[in-house]
Curated annotation (Swiss-Prot):
Protein name from the UniProt record: Autophagy-related protein 2
Substrates-to-products reaction catalysed: a 1,2-diacyl-sn-glycero-3-phosphocholine(in) = a 1,2-diacyl-sn-glycero-3-phosphocholine(out); a 1,2-diacyl-sn-glycero-3-phospho-L-serine(in) = a 1,2-diacyl-sn-glycero-3-phospho-L-serine(out); a 1,2-diacyl-sn-glycero-3-phosphoethanolamine(in) = a 1,2-diacyl-sn-glycero-3-phosphoethanolamine(out)
Annotated spans, Disordered: 129-168, 237-274, 386-417, 494-540, 1717-1737
Ranges of Polar residues composition bias in the record: 494-507
Gene: ATG2
Membrane topology term: Peripheral membrane protein
Source species, domain of life: Eukaryota
Gene Ontology CC, one term: phagophore assembly site membrane
Family from the record: Belongs to the ATG2 family.
Biased composition (Acidic residues): 132-146, 254-274, 1725-1737
Major localization listed first in the record, in broad terms: membrane
Subcellular locations according to the entry: Preautophagosomal structure membrane; Endoplasmic reticulum membrane
Ranges annotated as biased composition (Low complexity): 154-168, 525-540
An annotated Gene Ontology molecular function: protein-membrane adaptor activity
Length: 1848
């Protein structure tokens, strides 16, 4: 214990020393000396001299003033502890300081040893004075006080530290005495104000009282009433009672501006040079400068007012002081020692913080420090550069310094075993998020506020190795309407424990602990031990604090580990609503902004530390090599329960299982998160379960896929796999969601409503960062200042000083890693399962499974992928797949992700790019029956999509948001509701863009390479496994190059390709703001009606390839893809009436008296005709208006009505190929069975005839034919006396057309190989699809326009009583051109149907067919509708061959009972109108069905006559009241039948071939007389009239005579060719070219080449047999040649021989054309043979009238050429005869050869003569009438000629 006395001498010397220190103040005048005595000195209004104070650490003193300073000495017993001492009492202290970041070593050492220097000076003074005059101490002290100005503190320090003389014993004693004297020094400071000024921030600190003294050798510092206020920037103080934001008045604003102007120079020059360094001034100058600079430094009471009155809080008015950010009621500090402080104890009372003004203040401080450090570093770098230049002669001394390093200095200090820190205790910390803070520490607005409360916080240090502590209570409380509730708290202990806690007792050291004793220290433990400890149920666990932690230092060899463990052992409860979420979100936003600015500051400090001197760096490097420091942080929590009340009806609770974090492992893990929902206060249910969450904060590599850029050579780019490294990685094992659809909609709607309210109210909160700075001053400088305060880090692109790059780019961890493959964050989810329970009552549920989900952020973009996903419908345990991978591969076999996502954000646009690959979406018609609730709410859904969509704010239109979908090899499966068939639409590639505009929402899509696949029965698919089973087994090992396309996959399953298209564009426009769009259209002059939804489809080229059975299946499938329309009788018609109806009231008695009316007629006009006309007029007035609905529609002004929906379809080119044969196995089996049955019946008949078991009469009564009819179109019949081969040959001839192999294109050969050669059929029956098509329809410019005017359902929606009728929709179909080509082998004609070119070229824009349908509802209350149809047709030219007609009838009449559907609601045609139709017909019969004639089929008589140019003109027809299309055909027949009989017989008979020329010549004679008469009546010129008539007569007569000659010559040629062929010659085959195609009717311009088909090929002979190596082959230009796929599998027989020994994929893609190998028949197959094994010797017939010359010159050339060709044939025959004669051995052989060749030798020149004559006559006739050549090209097939490139 210190002695309780002090010698008088020491007291005097102490007072002398204190008086000497008064030189720190400016010169003291007499007015300042209020009282001076020996033991008491009182000074008033004195200023502190900044120059005498000198350099302070980290700051500069700008101004200092003490209101009252009293110094006195006291005798023992008057102060604490007894004994004498010195009291220093300062009141009203005001200090202004500015930060200085240029902290030199000299300043730091000076401050460190300042107290030791003062002690040494005092000791010297005592020793010196005691030796000279010890007896006169008091007098000498009074008279000899001479204060010499010190040169500098550094010199004193140097002299003190540099003294090497050995101290005397008296000196040590006196130093001890000085220590004793200083221990009796008591300092008391009252009402101290410290203002911290900087360039961006001004702060004011106020302290009510500071008391410093020593008690029992312990230094005690007591601080009372500490508060901090922000002067600059002008921040929002927070909410007051009335929530009025304070604003400065004009007078105070001018004062503040004056203050800012006073400091403007200092702020501008602050970064470069301080005021103390740049000026040398006297005390008077300094005083004047600082007084002027600080005259208004401290705020006045009138600086802040609210409006014109005062806002009261309770009974006290709100202080008009600056915004307070901090208040502390008291702080007690105790420590031992002076130069070496130890055993530090801090006890703090209550701390209150207002975050509303605090956040912008801290941000401003951090930005200011960062800026100052950068400027100082730039100055230091410049000085070092100059210093290096000055020491260039002695570079080894450039960085030399004599100063001691930190380690050396610390080694010289005496070691102190006592720890520096002992404990810290804070009673309460209260942080308010919204309320303002008053001067006295009371929150100005406690209502509607959220406070963070930390109660009883303790930190203790047990020894140098362990620091522990905790927070007893942590909670977040909300004050609302005077009621305080906890929104965050920890679980409360038991009641008994709570009673114990309420009786807290102080510990032995005076610090109160809640549990009566300090918490035990936490030992270093693993997370598992912490978890077990927290989960224990002992009583001690309930007494633990809410938060506990320990810091443990562990030494192991050269490694120092500092381990920090934090434990939250209680369950946390968090409850949020809209108000609390708003406040907390703004609070978190402010904290994040502070953290971001702090990170920038730390990065700047780190860069500064790297620029230290090399010597210091070397010293630290050596120390680092000797000792390594590691940091470990472990966090363990208990479960956290968070509840969010979105609305009154929705409560969401999240249960977060214990959280564990390990810093060394960089891993945070959560075992599970449960999210429960409570809807409408009902039972709580678990909705979301998240399992195994792991967060890694270290580098981790992973694989990802990136999208390749598509190019024309690679239509389906395979994504590229890359390696990516992420610094943060989040792993989630599984996310499972279980919720009903209604609940999901309810939850989403409530969350959206919550979000909208949150977004609209967030910026309006007083504690938001945007409202934290009050920008009342509108000048530019303040705006820039405030924007710089709140500017988030990283946005400033200005670089200040060298070496200050972004801290993220300078991370040494990323060295040697490509920045292109670095991701900042990665999220990997193994599986996500969403179970939508009870989507609809009848529908069941949907299950969505996503597997291997990857999301990562790279270069501010978000990339991601989903490896696999599927959607399944679940109903009563049954699964129905909806969306899935088309091959249904297991997860480990999938090599490419099904979905890839790329999100790119820029300043103007945000784009989300989604790539979907190999996804199959199933459409089920049955689902439409299950979606009753969806259909019931269809109108509401339309309103939600269109009408309820709010227009986008124009201001936000700059930040556009687009979504783009790209699809590759995606499939749409079409499943009809009642049929077993199925179809797939395969999309090769496509894109779809979603654009959100201001007034409209757009969807623009483009799809390419779309193909359609079809199968008749899905059971057939299931029975057909893949050919190569090894493919699926080894798929995992295959690279991405072995990609299987959907076309290949489904073709192997038995599907056939029925068509496709190359490109289709789809555009959908949703008009969300109709009014604005209408205004825009008015300005642009657009008068069309608007629609809510506008759909446009534009497609380029299409093709369909169908057989009769596949066509029937396709049509029935399309019909079954919609719900059947069946209405009840009371819905279609009014079956009951409200009142009785008297039919007699509607009868008009004068109805039949109209004919007897006397009508006056004009003179000279016959009465009968006038009467008839009048009667017709009267009758017409009684009839209803035929155009009533169309006129009503036309009355609607354009642009004044908004339609619900519009559809526009435009198809550029469409080709339909009709094939003979059958695609389906069941059809072929049925035909084969019928053939067997017919043959069996025929066999029985032959047996009966041979055994003569039947009578002759009975046999005659039986039918001549044995026949059977299948599918309503296939007639299998055989004469009773015929053989099996006759039936088989006839079927094969009709189906396969008996084509030679040389007549097919390579494409047709490939299809024939696939369809025919791979299978065997009964008795050589060729029932598969024919090798070539029989009919091809070519349509161009098909346009369909649909306008929907009403979607109202009278059964559900109300009906307007005043509505007389209701227009439903308009449908308009236009067909530009139509050409139907005849490709039947036995037909010689080209076009079956085309435009009549002889009537002149069609008008531009005129459609060949136009169909307009208007659907109306006559009674708006009934659901039934009626159709009004109008048809317009251009003149049509028909060339009908009987074989072609039979094929069409057989094709179109095909019906399979397996695909029959009940009839839907039959369309009622109210009115049908067709315009006049002009027909010109050519008909060529081949045979006559006499059986049909005998059965009464009168139409069969047409087959007796050949028609050539018969004309039929059908007048306009209008019919009414038709039920269905069959009734329409019957009605038209009744209308046109009498007209044809009365007026068109002459035109038909004029086309009879025998009399055609006579009729035409007769027409010429008529023209010879009729034309001159008409012309003469017209102009009166006789000669010209006769000339015109003569020319017409000569032209007609001449052409007909020449045409007659051509027919005679051609007939003669045909007879001669047939005779030659009978005698062994070539016949008509000589006219055919050696190599030609058979497909000219497609476009009449394509080039074909000869080919041969491969049946079974030896792979070893592939190259040797290739025609590519033998001769040139013309390339097939058919654009569909490579797109036609058919099944490679024969499903008819079980013993099919498949092609082996060759890669089938190579064969299908090869350009080689191989020869046939006929030896492919298996042994033992006597009754079955290959389809291709039959002899096919038939030819495609070519007419002699084809390839007609256009003029006489060309005719002569062709005549010469044809005659030469025939002479060449004769020459060749003569050469052959000569060779045979030379080879003959006897005269008989010679005569035989001569007799065989002579007819051919003599006939062939005659054939050449007739052919030459016909060609010459054709050329002459076509030159006379050039229109005939146009007709001939449309009518006849063309073969290739040597002159041009026309081909068949």
């Amino acid at each position: 214990m210190s002695p309780q006395w002090m010698p008088q001498n020491i007291q005097k010397r102490l007072l002398l020393y204190v008086l000497q220190q008064l030189s720190l103040f400016s010169e003291i005048d007499l007015p300042n000396l209020e009282e001076v005595s020996l033991n008491n000195i009182v000074l008033r209004d004195i200023s502190i001299d900044p120059e005498k104070v000198g350099k302070l650490p980290g700051c500069n003193l700008r101004f200092g003033q003490v209101g009252t300073l009293e110094l006195n000495t006291v005798t023992g017993g008057t102060i604490i502890g007894g004994g004498g001492g010195v009291n220093v009492d300062a009141r009203d202290v005001e200090v202004v300081i500015s930060p200085d970041f240029d902290i030199n070593e000299e300043v730091r050492k000076e401050v460190q040893f300042s107290l030791a220097q003062s002690t040494a000076d005092l000791a010297k003074t005592i020793i010196k004075d005691s030796d000279s005059a010890a007896e006169d101490e008091s007098d000498d002290t009074d008279e000899e006080i001479v204060v010499e100005p010190k040169k500098s503190r550094s010199s004193s320090s140097s002299s003190f530290s540099g003294s090497t003389s050995k101290p005397s014993a008296l000196s040590a004693v006196m130093s001890r005495a000085v220590e004793m004297a200083l221990s009796r020094l008591q300092i008391k400071i009252t009402n101290m104000k410290i203002k911290l000024v900087s360039e961006m921030t001004d702060l004011l600190f106020e302290v009510d009282e500071v008391l410093i003294n020593t008690v029992n050798g312990t230094r005690v510092v007591k601080i009372t009433g500490v508060r901090s206020m922000t002067l600059k920037p002008n921040v929002n103080p927070g909410e007051l009672v009335e929530k009025v934001v304070q604003s400065p008045q004009k007078d105070d604003t001018s004062d503040n501006e004056e203050d800012d102007s006073n400091y403007e120079d200092d702020n501008n020059d602050y970064g470069d040079e301080s005021l103390m360094d740049s000026m040398v001034f006297t005390h008077e100058e300094a005083s004047s400068i600082y007084l002027s600079a600080t005259s208004q430094s401290f705020p006045r009471p009138t600086s802040y007012n609210v409006d014109e009155g005062e806002v009261h809080v309770g009974n006290e008015s709100v202080s008009s002081d600056p915004p307070a950010i901090f208040h502390m009621d008291y702080c007690d500090v105790e420590f031992d020692g002076l130069s070496n402080v130890s055993n530090l104890k801090i006890d703090i009372g209550t701390i209150k913080v207002a975050t509303t003004p605090l956040a912008p203040t801290i941000i401003s401080i951090l930005n200011g420090i960062t800026r100052s450090l950068k400027i100082k570093n730039h100055q230091k770098w410049t000085q070092q550069a100059l210093k290096r230049q000055q020491n260039s002669r002695f570079p080894q001394y450039a960085e030399t310094t004599d100063e001691l390093t930190d380690d050396e200095a610390s080694s010289k200090d005496g070691e102190n075993t006592d720890p520096f820190f002992n404990k810290l205790h804070i009673r309460d910390i209260i942080i308010s998020t919204t309320s303002a803070l008053s001067r006295d520490g009371v929150f100005a607005s406690p209502d509607n506020s959220i406070n963070f409360v930390l109660h009883n916080s303790n930190i203790k240090q047990k020894n140098d190795m362990l620091i522990y502590g905790g927070v007893e209570t942590f909670r977040i409380e909300q004050v609302k309407e005077g009621v305080t509730t906890d929104i965050f708290t920890f679980e409360s202990p038991t009641a008994a424990t709570h009673a114990e806690q309420s009786q807290s007792q102080p510990d032995s050291e005076g610090v109160s602990f809640a549990h009566g004793s300090p918490p035990p220290p936490i030992r270093p433990m693993s997370p598992s031990s912490i978890s077990s400890m927290s989960s224990s149920g002992s009583k001690s666990s309930t007494l633990k604090a809410d938060l506990r932690f320990e810091i443990f230092k562990k030494l192991e060899e050269n490694v120092v580990t500092i381990e920090t463990t934090a434990l939250l052992s209680k369950t946390a409860l968090l409850t949020l609503d809209l108000n609390s979420s708003l406040i907390l979100s703004n609070f978190i936003t402010a904290m994040n902004s502070i953290h971001s600015n702090f990170k920038v500051l730390m990065a700047t400090i780190e860069n500064l530390s790297k620029q230290q001197s090399p010597k210091k760096q070397k010293t630290h490097t050596n120390a680092a090599e000797a000792m390594t420091t590691k940091t470990q942080f472990i966090l363990q929590t208990s479960p956290i329960i968070m509840s969010v009340k979105f609305t009154q009806d929705l409560l969401v609770k999240a249960i977060i299982f214990p959280i564990s974090y390990n810093l060394q492992q960089n891993q945070l893990s959560i075992s599970k998160i449960l999210i429960n929902t409570t809807i409408r206060n009902e039972r709580e249910s678990t909705t979301i379960t998240i399992s195994n969450i792991v967060l890694l904060t270290k580098l981790h590599e992973f694989k990802s896929f990136i999208k390749r850029i598509a190019n024309p050579s690679n239509a389906n780019p395979i994504p590229r796999e890359v390696q990516v490294t992420a610094s943060s990685n989040l792993f989630i094992s599984k996310i499972m969601v279980n919720i009903a659809l209604k609940e999901l909609k309810f939850v989403i709607s409530n969350i959206v409503s919550f979000y909208d309210s949150f977004a609209s109210l967030s910026a309006k909160q007083s504690n938001s960062l945007e409202n934290s700075v009050l920008d009342f001053v509108r000048d530019r400088s303040h705006k820039l200042e405030i924007s710089s305060i709140l500017q988030p880090p990283g946005q400033s692109r200005r670089r200040i000083g060298p070496g200050f790059a972004s801290p993220h780019l300078s991370n040494p961890t990323f060295v040697n890693i490509s920045r292109n493959n670095i991701a900042s964050f990665r999220c990997s989810i193994k599986e996500v399962e969403l179970n939508l329970v009870q989507v609809l009552p009848k529908f069941g549920g949907l299950t969505l499974r996503l597997k291997d989900i990857l999301l990562y952020e790279q270069k501010n973009d978000i990339n991601g992928s989903i490896l696999s996903f599927d959607i399944v419908r679940v109903d009563d345990g049954q699964l129905q797949k909806f969306v899935y991978e088309f091959q249904e591969l297991p997860l480990e076999s999938i090599r490419l992700p099904l979905i890839m996502i790329h999100c790119k954000n820029t300043e103007k646009i945000s784009t989300v790019d989604v790539v979907i690959r190999n996804v199959l979406v199933e459409y089920y018609t049955q689902w439409l029956l299950l979606l009753d609730d969806f259909e019931a709410n269809e109108e509401k859904l339309a309103e939600l999509v269109v009408e309820k969509v709010k227009p986008v704010n124009p201001s936000s239109s700059q930040n556009r948001f687009d979504i783009r979908f790209s699809v590759f090899d995606c499939i749409i499966g079409l499943n009809p509701g009642r049929l077993p068939c199925k179809s797939y639409l395969v999309v090769g590639r496509g894109t779809s863009d979603f654009t959100f505009g201001v007034n409209q929402f757009y969807i623009k899509s483009s799809f390419r390479d779309v193909s359609a696949l079809l199968i008749d029965d899905v059971k057939n698919k299931e029975k057909m496994p893949l050919k190569d089973n090894s493919t699926s087994r080894s798929r995992k090992s295959l690279p991405t190059s072995s990609y299987t396309s959907p076309l290949t996959f489904f073709s192997n399953l038995g599907y056939i390709m029925i068509g496709g298209l190359n490109v289709v564009h789809i555009g959908i426009t949703f008009n969300t703001n109709i009014e604005e769009v209408m205004k825009r259209n008015e300005k642009l002059g657009i008068s069309d009606n608007l629609s809510l939804i506008d759909l446009k489809i534009n497609s380029d080229e299409h093709h369909l390839e169908l057989c009769a059975d596949s066509t029937h299946v396709l049509l029935q499938l399309i019909n079954d893809l919609k719900l059947p329309l069946n209405f009840k009788d009371d819905e279609k018609m009014k079956v009951t009436v409200d009142s009785s109806i008297n039919l007699m009231d509607d009868l008009d008695e004068n109805q039949f008296q109209l004919k007897k009316r006397n009508i006056s007629v004009a003179p000279g006009v016959e009465t009968s005709s006038s009467s008839a006309g009048s009667e017709n007029e009267n009758l017409e007035t009684i009839a209803f208006d035929e155009d009533h609905f169309s006129k009503a529609r036309n009355k609607i002004p354009k642009g004044s009505k908004v339609d619900p929906f519009k559809l526009n379809i435009n198809l550029s080119k469409t080709k339909i190929y009709l094939y003979d044969g059958y695609d389906w196995k069941d059809t072929r089996k049925a035909v084969r069975g019928a053939v067997k049955r017919v043959e069996a019946q025929a066999m029985k008949e032959r047996l009966k005839k041979l055994k003569k078991q039947t009578d002759k009469d009975d046999y005659d009564e039986e039918d001549e034919f044995i026949e059977e009819t299948l599918f309503s179109s296939i007639h299998v019949g055989i004469p009773r006396d015929a053989t099996d081969a006759n039936l088989t040959d006839r079927i094969n001839k009709r189906v396969q057309s008996s084509l030679q192999e040389t007549d097919m294109t390579p494409e047709e050969a490939q299809k024939a190989q696939i369809n025919v050669e791979l299978g065997k059929n009964y008795k050589n029956l060729k029932l598969r699809r024919s090798r070539v098509h029989k009919i091809m329809a070519d349509f161009t410019n098909i346009e369909v326009n649909v306008s929907v005017y009403s979607t109202r359902d009278p059964r559900k929606d109300p009906t307007d009583e005043n509505l007389p009728y209701e227009l439903l929709n308009d449908v308009e179909v236009r067909l530009g051109t139509a050409d139907v080509y005849d490709n039947v082998a036995t037909s010689t004609w080209n076009k079956l149907l085309t435009y009549m070119n002889t009537s002149g070229e069609g008008e531009i824009g005129k459609s060949m067919l136009k169909l307009a349908i208007t659907n109306v509802r006559p009674s708006p209350k009934l659901v039934s509708s009626e159709a009004i149809m109008k048809v317009q047709v251009l003149p049509v030219r028909l060339h009908i061959d009987q074989d072609t007609l039979d094929f069409l009838m057989r094709f179109l009449e095909f019906k399979d009972s397996r695909f029959s559907l009940p009839l839907d609601e039959i369309v009622y045609i109210q009115k049908f109108q067709i315009s006049p139709v002009m027909l010109k017909l050519d008909y060529k019969p081949k045979r006559v069905d006499y059986v049909g004639i005998r059965s009464g089929n009168s139409a069969e008589f047409m087959n007796f006559f050949i028609l050539d140019g018969s004309t039929i003109n059908l007048a306009e027809a209008t019919v009414y009241g038709l039920l269905g299309m069959p009734s329409l055909g019957k009605a038209l027949g009744e209308v046109w039948g009498p007209q044809i009989q009365q007026t068109q017989i002459a035109g038909i008979l004029a086309g009879l071939a025998p009399i055609r020329s006579i009729v035409n010549i007769g027409g010429g004679v008529k023209d010879l007389i009729a034309i001159p008469i008409s012309e003469y009546k017209k102009d009166g010129r006789l000669f010209r009239s006769i000339q015109k008539g003569t020319q017409k007569f000569a032209k007609t007569t001449g052409y007909e005579i020449l045409n007659l000659g051509v027919k005679l010559a051609s007939g003669t040629q045909v007879i001669l060719e047939q005779g030659e062929q009978l005698l062994g010659g070539e016949g008509s085959g000589a006219r055919l070219p050696a190599s030609r195609g058979s497909n000219s009717q497609k476009c009449n311009v394509n080039k074909r080449s000869s080919y041969k088909v491969a049946a079974k090929v030896d792979f070893n002979k592939l190259l040797a047999n290739s025609q590519v190596l033998n001769q040139s082959v013309r390339v097939d230009r058919d654009q569909y040649a490579n797109k036609k796929f058919y099944s490679y599998i024969d499903i008819d027989e079980d013993d099919d021989e498949l092609v082996t020994g060759i890669d089938k994929e190579l064969l299908s893609k090869s350009i080689f054309l191989l020869p046939r190998d006929d030896n492919s028949k298996k042994e033992g197959e006597e009754d079955e043979a290959d389809d291709s094994s039959a002899d096919e010797e038939g030819e495609k017939l070519i007419s002699l009238y084809s390839n007609q010359p256009e003029n006489i010159q060309e005719g002569m050339k062709l005549a010469y050429k044809s005659f030469g060709n025939n002479l060449k044939i004769t020459k060749r025959q003569l050469i052959n005869l000569k060779n045979e004669l030379n080879e003959s051995e006897n005269i008989q052989d010679s005569l035989k050869s001569i007799l065989k060749s002579s007819p051919i030798i003599f006939i062939r020149p005659i054939i050449g003569s007739t052919e030459a004559l016909s060609k010459a006559l054709m050329g002459l006739g076509n030159e006379i009438d050039s229109k005939r050549i146009v007709e001939s090209r449309d009518k006849y097939r063309y073969i290739k000629r040597a002159k041009d490139e026309d081909v068949l």
